[in-house]
């Protein structure tokens, strides 16, 4: 697809007071779709996610993941001159996104209520741990804390202890809902002509994802047990060791697959009629006995041999990849899902957005250095070179 094809959000300007993951993940997706995203950062240090690690040639892995295709503008919003720049910026903006500490945006005069009269078409998206209102609205919130508060940890891990997800799923979920809500607000503005306020709670985003375990524990019923990497209520569905030291992940969904699995994979057709395993509920209740039988059947086989049997039987399966395996994944390569973007550390690989379109190519522009675009953004707002120089001298930017 030609990069010249128009993108859905061409002409949309987003200003973001963002840090960490939730808001940057939201706005990076807006940038992918063509929006101009101006990222407001602290002069000197920038977004504190820049300092999380130095794994990407000296850059932070979190930061390069969530900040491509953005412009970095440094502003010290404690200074009057910087707040004046911000107001001028908002005159040209369609969307303001912020995930500052609770109450910080309001103290800066950047709440929807403070801005709506002067900027009636502006969409304001606030992302916070617990949302506005309620006893937790001022409580600090980080990804792991929300995983815990939402009940996610209670159903994740082993029987002995809970385990967090290996990536920032609470931040990601909030960022995804913020992104879709902004698209909805832009569509609504086409009908009403007015901007609107969006309130995204990390807690509520994660609780939405907890629908299955919540309903499983409906009206005081016992919740799903923690089952490690295996499914809590479907069996066999999870990882199994293989004779060559590898691990295979497999999943059965119905009784037809169970019979095929016994006959063609385990090559023990009679096991399908074992009264201990008649139906998923009994297989789940007797999972330890069934697991021992499966492990024994796989003990003389390699991962490839087990995979071949599962494929021939059309039983869903997967290898347990590490990160090197994902970088080299043949499916991603075959579908040409890797692109490249610039960065302060040079050109780096970047995964294309998962939803590909035949109508346009996503925007894949560089990850900015701190304040890299400050002078250009100020010039686009009408500030003369001598004014820009004065802002630098006064440490406004």
Model-derived segments and spans:
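N-terminal helix-loop segment corresponding to the beta1-alpha1 unit
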Residues: 1-191, 369, 375-397
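Glycine-rich beta-alpha junction loops
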Residues: 44, 130-131, 202-207, 244-246, ...
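Oxidoreductase and adenylate-handling cofactor-binding alpha/beta cores
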Residues: 175-195, 208, 212-219, 262-268, ...
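Conserved Rossmann-fold dehydrogenase catalytic segment
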Residues: 132, 159-169, 190-206, 225-232, ...
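Aromatic-enriched alpha-helical interface/lid elements that frame and gate functional surfaces
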Residues: 236-313, 317
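Conserved PLP cofactor-binding pocket of PLP-dependent enzymes
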Residues: 311-332
